Each structure stands twice: as structure tokens, then as C-alpha cells.
């Protein structure tokens, strides 16, 4: 199927198309920028923004030159903002190779308040930077500049030698040089004396805690909360959440302003408003600040001998371009602070230890934009806190996007049901004439079916002439395609697109046959866009030449007025599914029978393969649990212990035979009862808790010992129908570790003897001081990671020791890095962490999974001097048990997926059977043939009911709604017996119908398909239990009981007698028991008995000499003549 625009799927081809669009958009950005530079005051923004349709051809060479010049200017501009100064250094000699023109005045001017002796340094090309600052400042700067990940140490606090003024030195490395921004420390600030990560976090701690506490499931709530927190944190006049759409245009999705400011919520902007080059810079430099758009820029003087132009991409001081400054001033924004929101681009994580393979592809999802109506400066600690907050926000956005994808996957299952429902009724006209119809399939403004040269319409549609014109165009220009999807018929080249107007801009069309088509239509995008700000006042008119929000919004509407909202991938999947089903809807009965046989074969194969695989996994699971060296125990739904392995018996002193049958809450310490009770309740509801700590009592000789401390994972035990039948606990004994930790925290003197003790009970421990430098690394950590103490000491714990790039212990991705930072910073501020899952790659590539516990380290006065981090590792046996558990879950999931697939696939041949039956009904048939067709219809209705039974619990627990249908008992009985005739003939069993004629002709009210299902199930079990050559009979009696004047109850009793030894006791106990351990046949009997109970009836089974009888009683209503 062809498409006029590139899709946004995660495949390589779509990425190449996406890259091509970015390149094309960059050329458009460059052209717009060149027009602005050349036109000066005569620049017309509204007309220039519509450059998307400029032909390439002969203008391409010029366009390439314009683009190259534009990118050079964006990345290698030679001006900075005046709120600070800049130096560029040679990385080897630390001598100045470039400086801003205001640097000599800011850094070397003599202050009369600071006495000085000797010559004053003069700032210029070639000067050693260490001569400009005090001795300690020069040493701190030299240490930082020699650091691998230099940005981790930002900011470095330095003092000028001449004036004594404090500055934050913010360093970043570019090719061939070091760039340093110097920002004055304001008099009201408390100077930050060390690396900023742990210090800056305190500013954003409240906001991060609030974001992380939000319930998932609402992107709008998440964005609104983020905007609110940034508004309170920064104090700017306006804060907006800005999202990029698939076609790169932007939308304000959340906003908060101070009173009196015009809102921009809901405004859409063309992609050119934030150029691709600027977006690239946001990916590199996550926070961007403009202090005063009216301030005069300062030139950067560069050593003329340098063989390259300096790039200022990573500098906060980098001056914005004049077109952006005009845009800001026109929207009454003098200062801005912008944070990038960078999320995963949909790739799966690699499992390789190679960092390039294990990182996800990133994309710029949007921006958090702060504006101020007056000049405003945000100091570096606040900007760093904002960057950290934006990283946490990006992780949460990513999770919301994953939830949305899961929701879409669930919609696929719903769609399959919807499609089948459509085709079960009068295909194909039922998909437009009944409800639900094809407009319910996807979001659209109109749809049409062209079938046998007749048009069937829904919603907005072209005229007959226009639609036939579209079909002719498709047949001529898209001959080899099965259809077309486009968000702009005009851009796709349809000659009559403009005549269709705004009502039909986008179209998805699929070919069903040579002459039959399906169409969906969408109106132009502007119809979906809502202006969220104040309306124009009477007589007020925008200046379309200027760059500001109203002109951008107008420009956006101009660009999209012939375009609709794009068709999403999942929408096209639905369309393709309907197309394929319609194509196959009219296959002959032979094809239907072939499909049915194929499905039965798959079911049988699945049963055999699945049971063998499940038995093998179960046997291995039991062996591992019994022999595991970790405590494993289990309870049933009532909390009674039904599993207690050797290890937990050894730890507690309670033998297996004594533990079985006891309630779990009687075995745990009183202080842990509430914790365990909560775990049980959540697990039985399907919510499995992990890494929960509780204590369990000791018994026998160990009764007087301390209780056993466990870290426990709870998982729900489920049967083959995915019903929860108990809870399994996989634990880790931490009694020894806890005693060590308790002793450790009480130590006031020299703790090093404990930390560095190589005793196996000492867990892996590492630590950091209050500034983020690694200060502890015990021998257990060396054994675990492969890195010696000397390799990591005095390195930044966040970034150098644990990080995502060149760190000693590489974390899996950026999300893990940010979460680790949050854990450490929470602990510094007093929020000590529970056992948290943690993972990293050790020195030689092995991935280590463990639990992390972080505690703050205090001095004698109680002040925080750093952190201690303890790692807890799972034993080999526990890891193997968890691996087998995952295999078991994967096997169950595989079975469920295959069963769900087969259940859906049954619908298609079933619709073919129905169609064939309806065709036969229209022919001349004899009375006997009509009766056979009627029996077939009865069986089909029963099958429909069973396929709709997705929730067995509702039947078993008695919540199913029964239908009230009028039926003759004769019809139900014939359909039920027909379902066992093949089996009985194979065993040469004679079935006799001993019902009296009057009873068979009785007309009743009730759920006839369910009654038919019940009788067929009991007949089948009876046939299975009857020996070959035996006999089976069915008889019944009816008792009427009048209630009132018009209603009569029918108390109906069926007796199914069969010869032989009878139904096995085990099967009968399953019928009268629960579904927990029932076999497939037992489940069938149990469901049948529950259905009988829903009909106010009961089932009995009598054994006699040489024969047995099922007695089934139900309560129905008699259909009176007056009714």
C-alpha cells in the first residue's frame, strides 16, 4: 500500500525517511534564515514560512550553499551574551587561544578593596590561565581541566587574583580546546564550593518527589505538574510545556502564567519556529538561557594562528541569533530559560556489554520553556537543578509513552473483535449499514464503501462524481498498489483536491477487488487546532511580517490548510486487517473446511507440545525449590502454608510437616504481621511486591535465637487458566548482613576495619563524601566489579565510577543513571532508601543485578559527611530459580497468545460457515434438510456463546447474565445429541431419546444456548464413560408451577443414564469442587454445574449396579399462548 508521506515506524527504512525529512527541513530553516538576513525590515514572516513547496531542481546548488553557511553560523558564531565572559584554552598547555572582549575587564580589573603587590596580569592570547586567579583557585581549575569527564565537576569556584571577585567556572571540552564560561557569583548567593550535582539537587528535591509520586496514566497531568513545579522553582513569568508532533511542528500542551499575561495554551507552530539545527543543539546542551534579548552581544577574539573556528555549541553564554531575539521581543519576552525533554526513540535495549549497543536511540520529545517580561538571570546551581528535573521528567514521559503503546496493543485485540462483529452481519454491507461500522474502526470525518458500482456513505463524503474521479486516479497512478494513505490529496497529486474543499484533505483507500473500494476521509488540520489564547479585539490586526506567536499560528494554519492529521501506523493496521478479512469473506466452503481442519490441528499440536513443555518446566521447578539454598515457601488463597522448602525449615527450625497447614501470619514476628498481610492481599489481587523486608520466628532448639530477617519477592501462583490460586515467596536471608549493618551504624570510631574486612558476611560496600567523590570501596566490591580500590578512589561516583559512557561500572542507560542520582541525592537530604533494584556492567562485561541500600554517614555533631551504599546479591540458586520462573511465565504467555490467536481465527471460518448456511437456506430444500440446517444454526449459536466466554470467573462465581429466549425443547435436545453422535457411533453406543412427545413440543423461555451447552457436556462425559457397545438414554419430566396470573414456572428434570462403571470419582470431585486443580474435562463439568446453578437448578450423580445417571434439574418459564 502506497503512502504519500513517510511513516514514523521504528524500521531502518522509516528512519532513513525521517532523516531525509530532517535534512529537507534544515534546508527550509536555512532559506528562512537567509531571507531574514537579506530582507532586514522588509522581511515578511507569514509568506516566508511557506517555503515547503519550493521546487528543488536548479535551485539545489544555491540551497546547499545557503544551508552550509547557515549551519556554520549556528554552530560557530563568534558572539556571547554579556552576563559573563568566556575563555578558550589549549588543552595541553592551558594557555588562552580565544577570549571574549569583556573578559579582561571582568577577570583582571584591579579592585581597590583588595590590596595587591607586584605586577598585575594582563589577559591576552597565550597567557597561562593560572596566573589570572589565586593560587588555590588556579590549582582547583588545573585539577578540573585534567579530568576526563570535565563537565561532572561544574561549577569550579574561582577567585580573581586582582579583584578577589568570585566566579563560577563552567567548563566543557570541544575538539582541540577547552571552553570555560565565567559567571559572576551574585552577592546574595552562598557560593557552591564543590561539584554541583549533589548540591544542586536540593533545589529540585521537592519537585522531583512530587513528579515521582504522580499516578501513571495521564500525560496531561504529568505535563501540568512539571510546568507548575518549574514555575515555582525558577520564578519566571510564564512556563510552557512544548511538544513536537510527528511532522516536527510544535504545540503548547501545558502552560502557567502570572496574572495579566496572554495565554498560548493550545497554539500550534510550524516546524521552522524551532529550527532543526537548534533542536540538535538542545540534544547536546540540555538547558539554554537568554538573560536579556535587548542586551548588546560581546565578540569573541580568536588566535589568528588557529587552524579551525571555535564552536560555542556547549556554552551557556553563546549568543542567540537576531531572528530569535526579534521573535522573543515581539512576544514581550525579554528573558528565557529552556529545558530539553529527551526520550527514547523506541529501540530495544541491547544486551551487549558494548556501550554503543546498549544505549537507546534518543529523540527530542519537546521543551519546557520559561519566559520573563524583564531581564532575568538564573545562576548555575538553579540551572543544574532544572536540568536534573528535566531528566526525571523525561523518564516519566517515556513511561507514559510506553503505557500509550501498551494501550494501542490492547486496542488491536479489540479491533479484531470489532472486525469480526462487522462481518458476522450481512457482509460486506453490514460494515456501513449497522453498528459498529467502519467509522468506529478509526478516527475520521467520513467513510464510504464502493461495492458493485454503488456508493454507501457515512459522514462527510465527496460527491459521486468526485469519488469516481478519485477511483480513476488511483487506478491510473497507483495501479500496482492495494491502496493509498495520505494526509494531503493535494500534495499526493490528485488533480481535483482543491475542489474537494476543507472537508476532504486526507484519505485512506484500500482495494477490496478490481472494482470494490473502501475509503476513509479526514478534514484539514486547522479544524482540529484550537486557539487557546485571548481572541483579537475588534479592530486589532496582527503585523504578518513579524515573527511572534500569532503570526506563527497563522503561518501554521496556512501551511496545513490542505493537510489533515496524519494516519497513524496502528490505524493503518486496522484498515489492512479489514481489507484482508473482506477479501477472504467469500471463499467457498472447501476453503472454510480447510481452515477449520487447520485450526483443529493447531489446537491438538498446542495441547501436546504445551503440556509436555509445561510438565518439564514444572518438574524442574519443583526440584529447584526443594534443593534451593534460599528460603522458598508458599501459601494458598486462605494464607495457609502449602509449600516449605528445606532451607526455610533449616533457618527457622520448623520442619516441613509442622509448617504445612499453619497460617503464615502465625509464623512471622508481630512487627511484620501488617507487612506480610499487605503482601498477601496485593499478591492475591495480581499486584506482586518485590524486595520487602520482614522477620520470621524461630522454633525448636533455635526458639530463643533472634528472628530470621528476610528480603522477599512475592509472586502470585496461577493455574493454566491464569487464575490466582496462592502466593509463592522467594526470599534471601539477610540476618547476618543486617547484624553487620546494625553494628556498623553503631560504630563511632574507626569503621574501616569492618568495611575492609574480607569476611564473606561483609557485603559489597562503597561510599561517597558530601561532594560526590568516591571515598570508600571495600574488598567485596573489588571482587564483584573487578575494579580495585585505587582505580576508583577520588573519582566522581556519578559519572566516573558509575555512568553511561566511559565509567568504570557502566549503567545500562541514561534512565538508570538518573535514577541512581535521585537515590543518592534523596539519601543526602535525609530520605534513606529501601532495598532498590540496581544493575551495572562489571569490568569484564558481566552484568550484575543486585539490591542497593543507601544510608547517610554522620559525624559526631550529626552533620552529613557522605553516604554508604550496600549491595545485596542474589545467590546462584535463587537466580536459577528466578530464571526457571521466567521460563514458566514465558511458556504460559506463549500458550495464551497462541490460544488467543486461534480463538480469533475461528471467527473467520465460522463467518464462512454461517454464510454458506444462509446461502443454502435460500435454495429449495426438503423438510429433513431444513431440520439439519436448523440444528447446525443451533450449534453455531452455542459456539458463539462459548467464544465470548473470556471471563470464566464470572460464570464460576455466578455473575453471568442469562438471556431469555423462546425455544422448543425438541430443538435444544436434537442439537445437544448431534454433538456426541460422532463419538457414540465410533464406540457403537446406542443413544435413545425417551422424552414424551408433549414434552418435546413444549415452548419455554430461557437461555437455550446455555442449556444446550450443559446437556451436550453431560452427554459427552456419559459417552466417554460408557463402554463400547453400551447404551445411553435421555429422559425428562416437566412440572409447572403458576406464579400470578400470567407467569408459569417450568421445573424441568433431565436424566441421562448410561451403562458401565460410571464417571471416575476424581472427575466428579472436580465437578463439585473448585477450579484450582481441575483437568480440562473437569473444568467443563464444573462450568456446566455452575450454569445449572444460574438457572436455579442442581446436578446429581447416582451409581447403580451396572449403570449410572446424571440428574440435571433447571428452572425455566413456560411460554403461554397469551404471551
Swiss-Prot record:
GO terms for cellular component: nucleus. Contains one covalently linked phytochromobilin chromophore. GO terms for molecular function: phosphorelay sensor kinase activity; photoreceptor activity; protein homodimerization activity. Residues 690-746 form the PAC domain. Keywords: Chromophore, Photoreceptor protein, Receptor, Repeat, Sensory transduction, Transcription, Transcription regulation. Phytochromobilin binds at residue 323. InterPro entries: GAF (IPR003018), GAF-like_dom_sf (IPR029016), HATPase_C_sf (IPR036890), His_kinase_dom (IPR005467), HisK_dim/P_dom (IPR003661), PAS (IPR000014), PAS-assoc_C (IPR000700), PAS-like_dom_sf (IPR035965). Residues 1-20 are annotated as: Disordered. The keyword ATP-binding does not apply. Signal peptide: none annotated. Residues 901-1118 form the Histidine kinase domain. Residues 1-14 have a biased composition (Low complexity). Residues 218-401 form the GAF domain. Residues 617-687, 747-821 form the PAS domain. Regulatory photoreceptor which exists in two forms that are reversibly interconvertible by light: the Pr form that absorbs maximally in the red region of the spectrum and the Pfr form that absorbs maximally in the far-red region. Photoconversion of Pr to Pfr induces an array of morphogenic responses, whereas reconversion of Pfr to Pr cancels the induction of those responses. Pfr controls the expression of a number of nuclear genes including those encoding the small subunit of ribulose-bisphosphate carboxylase, chlorophyll A/B binding protein, protochlorophyllide reductase, rRNA, etc. PANTHER family: OS08G0260000 PROTEIN, PHYTOCHROME 1. Homodimer. Belongs to the phytochrome family. This is Phytochrome A. It comes from Solanum tuberosum (Potato).
